[in-house]
Amino acid sequence: MAQYDVAIIGAGSAGALIAARLSEDPARNVLLIEAGGRPSDPDILKPSMWPAIQHRSYDWDYKTTPQEGAAGRSFAWARGKGLGGSSLLHAMGYMRGHPADFAAWAEATGDERWSWEGLLPSFMANEDHVSGGDGIHGKDGPMPVWIPDDEVSPLTQAFMTAGNALGLPRIPDHNTGQMIGVTPNSLMIRDGRRVTVAEAWLTPEVCARPNLTIMTGTLTRRLKLEKSHVSAIELAGPEGLATVTASEIILSAGSLESPALLMRSGIGRENVLREAGVTCRVKAPELGLNLMDHLLGAGNLYATKKHLPPSRLQHSESMAYMRAGDFSAGGQPEIVVGCGVAPIVSESFTAPAPGNAYSFLFGVTHPTSRGEIRITGDAPDSPLIIDPRYLQTQNDRNLFRAALGAAREIGHRPELAEWRDHEILPKSLAASQDIDTFIAKAVITHHHPSGTCRMGKDEMSVVDADLRLRGLDNLYVVDGSVLPSLTAGPIHAAVQAIAENFTTGFK
């Protein structure tokens, strides 16, 4: 039986970073386990191929339950399967979040390490930012952060000018602590190519370290528990079943697979485990609960007066964050409007041909609806029940109305007259019920599932402020599942900062 000092389960946005950082110590024997392979599809590297690369062999391609708040639709949840995890598939946006987001984390955990100030060194350590070295952005880190300029579509330029005319300030980027305003999206792109976390952290030099073992195509079946200790990890790989041991185990399989593996191992809510035929060995009353995600309305659709050239980036080029009902207000964002240089609509509607229309996406930055994930059996291939319970709170419905209103106000501005012929969707909506019906049909996932193993200072939380799983002495969870609440924008930058912050304190 192979033995390691540290075993990391999952080579995605957190796991790849953790493996690279912890293996910097040549005396530490590190194992990185990944269920997927080493994807070589050249389309991954092409920013303009997002989101067309979803549903391929390196996508877990989950499905949610039908959502009452979204016109009864089920949603496809793209989750990366392979070295790099969901950085293989995401929209490449790099947005840290607002300082108030992290103040909520510090309050939830009772630990200032999770505040904006506490996480800033971790953000900067990860970044190779075009503005790096200015005291707020990192320089020479593994992950490039690029702000487009001439590459931005003229439609996006007009969108930003329209937002500015309404009172939104022009900001340098989304990552200075001020998110409200207009700016091109910061992107994890170098020389016109997507950069995954595998490329950034698992470089040939890192992979050649004698103290780092990387297993691909290897599924973690379950964790073997002895009292308050994980004694072994049961694997299924290319050569069949195997068991390994490690002094410390770090679970970084993501917001769906991390709680699923814990449940299959006998950790979780007693009733859920009992229904799945699993004996409960460690009670975790909130494991799998607190499931959060961002939604975007797709969309506020306009026909063009003239041909719209395709985006040279990733279609959604600028996200304008703002308060609801006041374009000139500052503080923590409540809603967002994004410029889509393509006719982006949900499957409820028929999209016009590319080049003939464009969409303004709209969403809520801090939704209060919460869902859950459950296992249905003890086998890794047993289906997961994923129920995000979208749009179940009045707060979310009210703010989505405000977000749609903001999108339409920007969309009808004179600054966009060069491009706008007429509005296709939603046309006239009189009553609140009509607006809610349209939104329910229009929303799509922003692909930010999180929160299912939330960190906190209370005993009900799944992990503590050190990210150690309550009830076990050698198991940590480090990925998007530990978020106690959502950041205002895409969560990828925050997940990387969580992983970096964790490694600095890991002994």
Swiss-Prot record:
GO terms for biological process, alphabetical: vitamin B6 catabolic process
GO molecular function: flavin adenine dinucleotide binding; pyridoxine 4-oxidase activity
pH dependence (record): Optimum pH is 7.5-8.0.
EC code(s) of this entry: 1.1.3.12
Cited SUPFAM superfamilies: FAD-linked reductases, C-terminal domain (SSF54373), FAD/NAD(P)-binding domain (SSF51905)
Cofactor: FAD
Temperature-related properties: Optimum temperature is 40 degrees Celsius.
Cross-referenced Pfam families: GMC_oxred_C, GMC_oxred_N
Subunit composition and interactions: Monomer.
Protein name per the record: Pyridoxine 4-oxidase
Species for this entry: Microbacterium luteolum
